[in-house]
């Protein structure tokens, strides 16, 4: 959906409730490009379905429940102009902070994996691995095999994917040794993780 999409179009609604984009993406991917450009009110309606994997739409006469088990993938620039860290960037630190603050902490807590993609010079992008200087990339087939193996490991261990495990099941199937607990504790401190984010 485009960043001008309304909350009703995104999660569903109307006088006769109809499913929105999140239900249409059930068991699939919902991609939101230019995330901070969406109105904050629209983004905040994602919090409930990201947690419960469904959306409840209440009207005077009835409530409608729609499935919403989707994988959210969102993209954003590092600053309003998109050139943070480059001589082309003219954004002030305050503009960068306001831009990033358009996405609330509670919504960010529900996004499990956040990756910053650094700017790469064009010569790096066009170099090939065979030239000895290019970016070392896995083929799609290699990535597919790693993902397939990881999913099978999860299914063998708990009978379901990690994302579908309850807190109790995580405690039962994902026991940690002391070294791992120490690493996680340091990560919580360093990254400022909340209980939900952890």
Features from the language model and the residues they span:
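P-loop NTPase switch/communication element
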Residues: 1-12, 70-71, 79
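Residues immediately C-terminal
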Residues: 30-31, 37-38, 122
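Basic, amphipathic alpha-helical bundle interface domains used for macromolecular binding and assembly
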Residues: 16-17, 40-198
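Walker B catalytic acidic pair
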Residues: 27, 33-35, 45
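Conserved alpha-helical scaffold flanking the Walker A/P-loop in AAA+ ATPase domains
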Residues: 5-30, 63
